[in-house]
Amino acid sequence: MKLLKIIPILAMMMLGALTSCTSENDTDIVTAVSDSSAKNQASIHAKIELEEVNLGRAEDFAILTKSGITNVYPSNITGNVGTSPITGAALLLRCNEVTGTIFTVDAAGPLPDRVTDAPGLTTAVGDMQTAYTDAAGRSNPDFLNVGAGIIGGITLKPGLHKWTSTLLIPTNIYLDGGADDIFIFQVAGTLTMSSAVRMILKGGAQAKNIFWQVSGAVTLGTTSHFEGTLLGKTSIAVQTKATVNGRLLAQTAVTLQMNTIKKP
């Protein structure tokens, strides 16, 4: 009789142990799934957070300005060139320097290949300004004031980079990322690249995915090499024989001196 009384008790104890074990395992599984889901959501959120800057019609241009383009002959430009609202007389490139179309607001631009398209240029310049505002307005930078504004000899990763004052590039730098990775650089002051300095892409990074928003004047030193689209609030000066794999989009003027500019 005692044995019969003990058996139900033992059965209940075993059932409780099994239930407890199962519950604990289930909790571990749920926790693991939750952690994995949270990480995945964070990863997806990070990727969605930084989108490329939409250039609109400005994307079609290698050089686009509001107040003219000066030039020391010869330069070699691959991509369209335009200036607006200033007269085409302020665009001082020759037709044989441009592999693309030269757009002006009037008949004063260089002949014989100049195309007059005031409405199209108005749209492109408006899109350029919108793109600048977009890039400048991106918040929550991944990297803030790297190198205290002096970034020679370092490798920059994809993401949103911000400098709250001037930026100097005194020696070579590297941009390391995949083919689809986006780089956005916000510079609150001037941007200066020293002479003979090179910007080098690694890991499949592409110039078309690199955007530099600069509040102050931009100076690219003699024989330097630059990668990406420059969205300048003021002027962009490209010194003697410097090269650019990207775009020069300036809200004032661009100055050239025997340069090679190639739209990505």
Model-derived segments and their meaning:
Residues 17-20:
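C-terminal motif of bacterial Sec signal peptides marking the signal peptidase cleavage site
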Residues 22-264:
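Solvent-exposed adhesion/ligand-recognition segments of exported proteins
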Residues 1-9:
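Bacterial N-terminal signal peptides that target proteins for export
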